[in-house]
Amino acid sequence: MAAEEGQVIGCHTNDVWTVQLDKAKESNKLIVIDFTASWCPPCRMIAPIFNDLAKKFMSSAIFFKVDVDELQSVAKEFGVEAMPTFVFIKAGEVVDKLVGANKEDLQAKIVKHTGVTTA
C-alpha cells in the first residue's frame, strides 16, 4: 500500500501504519501525520491543502493521513485530542505538533523542519 512520490499515505489498519511508519523512518525524511476524522469539517477543508503540500515537499517529507476513528490507539499514542492534529517526526522523535486547520502554520512548520523553503 505504498504511495507514489508526492502522495499522502492513508493508513487504515494498525499493521499498515506500523509498516509504513517504519519505512518512512528509514528514509530520514520529515514525517508529517494528519490525524483526521470523516465527520470533521475543518479536516475536510484542509485535506486538499495537505495533499498539495505532500506534492510540494515530496523530496524532503513523507505525509500520512490517519483517521482517528479507525486507528484510535495510534491517535492516543500521539496524544491527539482535537482534529485536525498534525504531528511532525524527525529522526524517530516527535519534534512538533499543530492543532487546527491553519494552512500558513502547517506550511511554516514543514519549512522549519525540512529546511526547504520552495519545492
Curated annotation (Swiss-Prot):
Localization per Swiss-Prot or TrEMBL: Cytoplasm
CDD domains in UniProt: TRX_family
A single cellular component GO annotation: cytosol
GO MF: oxidoreductase activity, acting on a sulfur group of donors, disulfide as acceptor; protein-disulfide reductase activity
Enzyme active site: 40 (nucleophile), 43 (nucleophile)
Record domain Thioredoxin: where: 2-115
Subunit-structure text: Interacts with MDH1.
PANTHER family: THIOREDOXIN (PTHR10438), THIOREDOXIN H4-RELATED (PTHR10438:SF453)
Function of the protein: Thiol-disulfide oxidoreductase probably involved in the redox regulation of a number of cytosolic enzymes. Possesses insulin disulfide bonds reducing activity.
Protein name: Thioredoxin H4
Annotated source species: Arabidopsis thaliana
Gene: TRX4
